[in-house]
A protein has these predicted regions:
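Conserved class I S-adenosyl-L-methionine
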Residues: 146-166
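A short glycine-rich, Lys/Arg-flanked "PGG" loop and its adjoining helix->strand segment in the class I
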Residues: 131-143
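Conserved alpha-helix/loop element of class I SAM-dependent methyltransferases that forms part
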Residues: 29-48
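A short acidic, Gly/Pro-enriched loop at the edge of an enzyme's catalytic core
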Residues: 106-117
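Class I SAM-dependent methyltransferase Rossmann-like catalytic core
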Residues: 16-30
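A short SAM/SAH-binding and catalytic strip from SAM-dependent methyltransferases
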Residues: 116-129
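Class I SAM-dependent methyltransferase SAM/SAH-binding core
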Residues: 51-107
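N-terminal, positively charged/glycine-rich alpha-helical extensions of SAM-dependent methyltransferases
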Residues: 1-19
Length: 166
């Protein structure tokens, strides 16, 4: 049982294959309120750039694009998710506003002072080096611009995982 739990947990950090797709759908449902609040909080213009760390299947990116029509950038460690996020965001891609990469937030491949906003939902738990990741985000964010990081508390996760309630 421990191996199965560990395997499924790893899928939330690096979704791959059919199980990874299912995990992303579950995340889309569980994180829906976070997505809505994140989109509402991000205040950008269509000529600005936003970076989403851990874009998964592109669900949040699509919501951001639908509201702001901004340039969308994303970095995720999952090759499979790049494919899914690209197909989910065809409209932004056709407009030349979708720029997805496979990689790690601890080594962001962007110039300093590039983004007007950076978002991340429930990914910080999986970063290889939290301090380095935060430092990289600070480097690529324009001065005074926000980093939106939404996470669940340990207590909330325990309610969901162990008591089966949301």
């Amino acid at each position: 049982m421990k191996k199965i739990t560990k395997y499924i947990g790893s899928q939330f950090g690096n979704p791959r294959g059919i199980i990874g797709k299912v995990c992303c759908i579950i995340m889309n449902v569980i994180n829906n309120a976070m997505y809505r609040n994140m989109v509402r909080a991000i205040k950008i213009q269509s000529d600005e750039k936003v970076l989403d760390i851990g874009y998964g299947n592109g669900y949040l990116l699509k919501k951001i694009y639908n509201k702001h029509h901004a340039d969308l950038y994303g970095i995720d460690i999952s090759v499979d998710m790049k494919e899914q996020a690209t197909s989910r965001n065809i409209e932004a891609m056709k407009a030349g506003k979708l720029h997805l990469q496979v990689g790690d937030c601890c080594n962001l491949p962007y110039d300093a002072d590039t983004f007007s906003a950076v978002s991340s939902i429930n990914t910080i738990y999986f970063w290889s080096d939290t301090i380095k990741g935060l430092s990289e985000i600070n480097r690529v964010l324009k001065t005074g611009k926000p980093f939106f990081n939404a996470v669940y508390t340990k207590e909330w996760l325990e309610v969901v995982l162990y008591k089966g309630r949301i």
